[in-house]
Amino acid sequence: QWITNESSRRDGHVLRATHDAMLVGIGTILADNPQLNCRLTDSELSDALLDKSILDEPITIHQPNVIILDSLGRTPTTSRVFEINNRKIHIFVSKGCPKDRIQALEQVGAQVTVVESISTRKSKSTDIVIDIKKLSIDDILTKLGELGYTSILVEGGSAIISSFVETMNFDKVVTYIGNTIIGGNDATPAVGGRGFKSLEASPQLTFTKTKVLDNNIRIEAYRQGRRGTYVHGNR
């Protein structure tokens, strides 16, 4: 079930606890039905923190709010994300989302926001081109900023991560490498989407930290020019 080990997963929960909110796409909700919460105690959180310099005040568990990008409002109202109390669930949908889906999600406590969509064109074969509608990341981040959010943990999956990378809407990358080789030509890439046409257009990273976590590797990097960006709004 897990590619990474317990130490890496514990560190991932630290990231959840130290951000204002975490963001996923509808694909993650439908495939995994996750709770998207921090499952560490206060003492476990303090012990697991890699950067001890931020322990200048008591650490308490912060359950991050949840942001779901869901164009058509397909999030089931029985999803486990609604099981955690005292946090907000934001669902961003397109103008084409059925009104009854918006109403159903609002009835179970979600805050639903309609945002603009952008069209991307993708070649399905050599002679067929299809239009794909994607929610505007810029519009979403603007609205989240208006709500007071300063740090968002984007957990994926591949399509969501590519949306942020392609629009340069990211400051920091934390990735984990497991110790198992799986392979496969059909394997899902960490960053999907269209990719960049040239190295010059591609975002460049500045690596700042690497750490071995019980035979896994944790790598931390910033997008070049964003090293000083404040990315942790909660502690």
At which residue positions do the language-model features occur?
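Enzymes that bind and transform nitrogen-containing heteroaromatic metabolites
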Residues: 1-235
